[in-house]
């Protein structure tokens, strides 16, 4: 008799917190929060995004690179030098950890774009194109993050081990996000761990996006190349498209990605009904379907979104100037035992 296998559905753990006053928080706090959700992952991916960690080089684009071999590093550096001036480059500091293995070359570059490299004068569009080129055309090279005064630290392992490996206890940031991965549709590899990032956007995600194919094709019309074959990648690019390029408020972008049901739209007053009908029609291919909970980080804050049926957990809390979002109440209380609101 054949053996029956059931698909393990996603149980990723996510957390994000920030100081509204810009107060910096040590990295051991986000590691502690993620460690409390150890059972939500399976050791095939952990990662963090941190904002405000490079104040002495805040005006430079900080490229965090994952490089499989020396040739990838050589080709990446040649490409970067052809378009940018490199202020400084160095290995990303790490600490030996027996639970983290098969590590790529981890390198960071602090860059200024050469004036002639800007596309129609738009510096950020040029940086995005560089990321697309490196990820798609240089074998063994992957841009983990490229924003200013922020960085993504990720890899294969449990998040608390990845955090210790990257020495996150030595960093301070005014925004932290963390993710423990339980991959369901793609393999566990260093580039596939969360967060996914573009410019100062970073996305962590728990769930499954069934609209990946439609979303991917839609983004490709605007020049984005989804090379990781993972659903979370499309979310990072989608928010860049809607907010930075289409200049939509983040509240409207959220209503596009997590659109109202048509039945709900029909019950709205006339003005709202017309607006949401238009959004659903114009941005039909930007609608994200499936069970999911998402935390989006950017230089000015964090945003939590969940699917319209709330099929993945997402808890929010506040204490003073601190805001928290997490998959579980316990992750928040581990670092803020008695929040003022939850």
What are these model-derived regions, one by one?
Residues 1-342:
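Conserved short alpha-helical segments that host acidic/polar catalytic motifs at enzyme active sites
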């Amino acid at each position: 008799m054949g053996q029956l296998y059931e698909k393990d559905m996603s149980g990723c753990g996510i957390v994000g917190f920030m100081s509204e006053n810009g107060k910096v928080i040590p990295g051991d706090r986000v590691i502690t929060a993620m460690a409390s959700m150890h059972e939500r992952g399976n050791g095939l991916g952990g990662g963090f995004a941190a904002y405000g960690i490079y104040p002495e080089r805040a005006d430079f684009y900080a490229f965090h690179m994952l490089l499989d071999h020396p040739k990838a590093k050589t080709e990446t550096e040649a490409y970067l030098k052809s378009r940018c001036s490199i202020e400084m480059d160095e290995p990303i500091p790490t600490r030996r950890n027996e639970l983290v293995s098969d590590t790529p070359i981890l390198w960071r570059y602090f860059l200024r774009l050469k004036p002639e490299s800007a596309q129609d004068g738009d510096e950020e569009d040029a940086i995005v194109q560089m990321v697309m080129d490196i990820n798609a055309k240089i074998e063994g090279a992957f841009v983990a993050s490229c924003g200013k005064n922020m960085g993504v630290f990720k890899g294969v392992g449990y998040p608390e081990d990845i955090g210790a490996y990257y020495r996150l206890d030595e960093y301070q940031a005014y925004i932290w996000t963390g993710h423990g991965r339980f991959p369901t549709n793609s393999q566990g590899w260093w580039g596939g761990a969360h967060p996914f990032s573009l410019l100062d956007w970073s996305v962590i995600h728990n769930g499954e996006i069934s609209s990946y194919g439609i979303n991917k094709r839609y983004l490709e019309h605007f020049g984005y190349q989804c090379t990781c074959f993972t659903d979370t990648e499309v979310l990072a690019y989608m928010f860049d498209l809607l907010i930075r390029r289409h200049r939509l408020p983040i509240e409207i972008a959220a209503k596009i990605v997590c659109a109202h049901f048509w039945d709900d739209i029909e019950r709205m007053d006339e003005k709202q009904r017309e607006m949401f009908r238009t959004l659903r029609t114009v941005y039909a291919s930007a609608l994200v379907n499936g069970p999911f909970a998402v935390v989006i980080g950017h230089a000015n804050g964090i945003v939590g979104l969940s699917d319209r049926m709330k099929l993945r957990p997402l808890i929010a809390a506040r204490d003073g100037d601190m805001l928290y979002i997490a998959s579980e109440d316990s992750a928040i209380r581990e670092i803020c035992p008695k929040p003022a609101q939850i």
